Amino acid sequence: MGSRAVLLLKGPSPPKHSILFLLNHKKISPAPSIRRFTTKATANGSSLEPPDVARLAETARISLTPQQVEEFGPKIRQVIDWHALLSVDLDSVEPSIRADTEGDNLRHDNPETFENREAIIAAVPNYEDPYVKVPKVLNKE
């Protein structure tokens, strides 16, 4: 008592309407019954129709109130869209930890001695050798 779903696609790109055949194998009938479903593209980018929550509940043999049917519809749509996102092939995308991956864009920091040290010390309001004292920037309370 199981079901198998086969998605048939024609051509290299996915069509606007794809055809899904559901084969129901039952012990009672010798030949499997075939039901045909078509899927349509929707405005939100998903290629599947909105879920029929009432039919899903009947198939799962659970009872839902009309409010629960309305509540679970968008949630089931999110799960379907998430699984569609997981099927995206990312093998051709190189892994990265940040957007800037072109290498070392910073100059080398080479220490240099400033020639006119006394002019800087004269311009600073508070100086204690060898430090320049500045007012606190962060107030820690």
Curated annotation (Swiss-Prot):
Which GO annotations describe the biological process of this protein? Answer: glutaminyl-tRNAGln biosynthesis via transamidation; mitochondrial translation; regulation of translational fidelity
* A Pfam family reported for this protein in Swiss-Prot or TrEMBL: GatC
SUPFAM superfamilies reported for this sequence: Glu-tRNAGln amidotransferase C subunit (SSF141000)
Q: What is its EC number?
A: 6.3.5.-
- From what superkingdom does this record's organism come? Eukaryota
Q: Which GO terms describe its cellular component?
A: chloroplast; glutamyl-tRNA(Gln) amidotransferase complex; mitochondrion
Q: Which GO terms describe its molecular function?
A: ATP binding; glutaminyl-tRNA synthase (glutamine-hydrolyzing) activity
Please tell me which top-level EC class this enzyme sits in: ligase
Provide the catalytic activity annotation.
Answer: L-glutamyl-tRNA(Gln) + L-glutamine + ATP + H2O = L-glutaminyl-tRNA(Gln) + L-glutamate + ADP + phosphate + H(+)
Q: Note the coiled coil stretches, chain numbering.
A: none
Annotated keywords: ATP-binding, Chloroplast, Ligase, Mitochondrion, Nucleotide-binding, Plastid, Protein biosynthesis
The record's subcellular location field reads:
Mitochondrion; Plastid, Chloroplast
- Write out the similarity annotation: Belongs to the GatC family.
NCBIfam families, from UniProt?
gatC
Q: What else is known?
A: This protein may be expected to contain an N-terminal transit peptide but none has been predicted.
Quaternary structure and interacting proteins, as annotated: Subunit of the heterotrimeric GatCAB amidotransferase (AdT) complex, composed of A, B and C subunits.
HAMAP family in the record? GatC
Main role?
A: Allows the formation of correctly charged Gln-tRNA(Gln) through the transamidation of misacylated Glu-tRNA(Gln) in chloroplasts and mitochondria. The reaction takes place in the presence of glutamine and ATP through an activated gamma-phospho-Glu-tRNA(Gln).
Instruction: Please give the PANTHER family that the UniProt record associates with this protein.
Output: GLUTAMYL-TRNA(GLN) AMIDOTRANSFERASE SUBUNIT C, MITOCHONDRIAL
Query: Could you identify this protein by its name?
Result: Glutamyl-tRNA(Gln) amidotransferase subunit C, chloroplastic/mitochondrial
Q: Which organism is it from?
A: Populus trichocarpa
